[in-house]
């Protein structure tokens, strides 16, 4: 019957979801608790470079508040 395919479909779905979820958690763990930023356009790259300069430790994912900006 048609429902015999459901277990295989569920297993295949889980196997397709695991890499995406695990990648997000790995990036979050390695980037100080924040998800990885992707610069798809040049403006986003400029923002990441600005955040890197402002952070003071040369990493874009270390955030500083407005009180630390000169």
Swiss-Prot record:
Main localization category: mitochondrion
Originating organism: Mus musculus
Keyword Electron transport part of the UniProt annotation: yes
Coiled coil: none
Keyword Transferase tagged: no
GO cellular component term, pick one: mitochondrial inner membrane
Any GO BP: aerobic respiration
InterPro entries xref list: NADH_Ub_cplx-1_asu_su-1 (IPR017384)
Keywords: Electron transport, Membrane, Mitochondrion, Mitochondrion inner membrane, Respiratory chain, Transmembrane, Transmembrane helix, Transport
Functional summary from the UniProt entry: Accessory subunit of the mitochondrial membrane respiratory chain NADH dehydrogenase (Complex I), that is believed not to be involved in catalysis. Complex I functions in the transfer of electrons from NADH to the respiratory chain. The immediate electron acceptor for the enzyme is believed to be ubiquinone.
Subcellular location: Mitochondrion inner membrane
Subunit structure: Complex I is composed of 45 different subunits.
Protein name (record): NADH dehydrogenase [ubiquinone] 1 alpha subcomplex subunit 1
């Amino acid at each position: 019957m048609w429902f015999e395919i459901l277990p295989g479909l569920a297993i295949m779905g889980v196997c397709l979801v695991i890499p995406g979820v695990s990648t997000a958690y790995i990036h979050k763990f390695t980037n100080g608790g924040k998800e990885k930023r992707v610069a798809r356009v040049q403006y986003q790259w400029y923002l990441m470079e600005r955040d890197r300069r402002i952070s003071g430790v040369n990493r874009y994912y270390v955030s500083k508040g407005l009180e630390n900006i000169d």
